């Protein structure tokens, strides 16, 4: 905990920027929810908070279990923490989804701390929101199975496009500076698992793009399978 507090002090300006972006995403979600989301589930405020907190806690625990992928360098690892968050957004709307995403990352920081000066944690939040927001907004606009599938497909596309660009433009250069290595060294790590990776753009194409597609597909599929079943348990749906 002391290391986390010290890291927060050293990166105060960055954390304030992250907070501003988080607030902006919550406001954006609230606007979309007000304009587009009809027939949302009514739930007492206390129960809503408890429900979001419960799913965020599950997501934070899932975030601790990371799976390396054969086609990507070792610093890209899959976790399934977006599943509870996407479920939360489908049950309660985009605002609850973004808040759940934020609480998930905060809980993970309390459980495990940060090894990336909060950069990786911020990236997880922002990239996760690019899946959660489009999927939940489109679903709540119509609340049908078809729109749920379309929303998750749109969210996967948005996450893949944004995540790939974000890695190329910001994350990879930032990590190179942070760890005192060159971008060429990062590319070389990718080349060890895939000889087709010879540049940053090819690293993104052959590692980041399939990583995000796979994560989006798995998250969407599990959410689709669990949504009604858990809904009956939590909301006594028939």
Language-model regions, residue ranges each:
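Loop-helix junctions at membrane interfaces
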Residues: 1-238
């Amino acid at each position: 905990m002391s290391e986390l507090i010290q890291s927060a002090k050293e990166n105060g300006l960055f954390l304030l920027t992250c907070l501003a972006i988080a607030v902006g995403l919550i406001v954006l979600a609230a606007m979309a929810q007000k304009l587009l989301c009809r027939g949302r589930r009514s739930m007492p405020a206390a129960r809503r908070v408890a429900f979001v907190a419960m799913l965020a806690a599950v997501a934070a625990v899932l975030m601790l279990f990371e799976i390396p992928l054969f086609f990507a360098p070792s610093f890209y690892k899959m976790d399934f923490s977006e599943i509870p968050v996407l479920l939360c957004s489908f049950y309660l709307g985009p605002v609850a989804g973004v808040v759940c995403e934020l609480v998930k990352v905060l809980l993970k920081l309390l459980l495990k701390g940060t090894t990336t000066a909060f950069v990786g944690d911020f990236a997880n939040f922002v990239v996760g929101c690019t899946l959660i927001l489009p999927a939940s907004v489109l679903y709540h606009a119509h609340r049908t199975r078809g729109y749920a599938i379309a929303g998750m497909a749109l969210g996967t596309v948005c996450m893949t496009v944004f995540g790939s660009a974000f890695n190329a433009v910001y994350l990879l250069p930032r990590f190179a500076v942070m760890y005192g290595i060159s971008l060429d060294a990062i590319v070389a790590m990718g080349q060890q698992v895939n000889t087709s990776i010879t540049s940053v753009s090819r690293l993104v194409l052959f590692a980041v793009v399939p990583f995000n597609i796979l994560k989006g597909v798995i998250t969407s599929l599990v959410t689709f399978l669990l949504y009604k079943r858990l809904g009956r348990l939590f909301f006594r749906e028939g």
